[in-house]
Amino acid sequence: MTVGGAPATKVSRLVSADESVAVSGPPPRFVGRGGEKLAAALERFGVVLTGKRVLDAGASTGGFTDCALQAGAASVVAVDVGRGQLDWSLRNDERVTTLEGVNARDLDPAMLPYAADLAVVDVSFISLTKLIGPIAACVAPEATILAMVKPQFELGKGRVKGGVVRDASERREAVSGVVAAAAEHDLAVRAATEAGVPGPKGNREVFVRLERGAATAAAERDALIEAAVA
């Protein structure tokens, strides 16, 4: 981005009425940067969304919702504890049902128009271990859950300096904790991968693919997690 013909490198840059503002490069594919993260995970996991009914827990501006629709999803229920954040284009899309002011930990199947074929999860300031149960109750028996693990919100208070988890062993602990919580709800990890785009502060987030069925062998489970956090 340039302002008055010069690169604008700080968000605090003030702009006068007579200065020109220009943005170079291609426009973003999605309404939020999370869309790029989900798109990369869908490709790596080989997940096809064509015709699927999706639950987006922690929708925010709608990056995941936008990505899901562009990937062929039939419909999306966008859930977020906040209000007024979802991009206007999605808010007015007939394929999107918006549930604002709803904490994902309070989700109940009766709130949704359907049992989702797939759930995508991107939440902050709360551990995924508190959300797995309610989300699992809102999806179909054969559904897939793609949850993005943010290590900085999975580790205990006081363990994350500067808001960034840099140690691979701590990232492993965070992902393992989510996988263990999922197992309590008969969900097994089938795949794991580092998110393609780092978090705003540089945190390396990890997507886990969870599905019901036979438990993944411990050695395979640990290998999946290790590869994703290495």
Model-derived segments and spans:
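S4-like RNA-binding module at protein N-termini
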Residues: 1-48
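Conserved class I S-adenosyl-L-methionine
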Residues: 49-60
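Glycine-rich SAM-binding Motif I of class I
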Residues: 62-63, 84
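Conserved S-adenosyl-L-methionine
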Residues: 67-75
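A short glycine-rich, Lys/Arg-flanked "PGG" loop and its adjoining helix->strand segment in the class I
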Residues: 129-146
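Short, glycine-/aromatic-enriched active-site segment of Class I SAM-dependent methyltransferases
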Residues: 151-167
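Flexible, glycine-/basic-rich loop-and-beta segments that form/coincide
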Residues: 204, 209-230
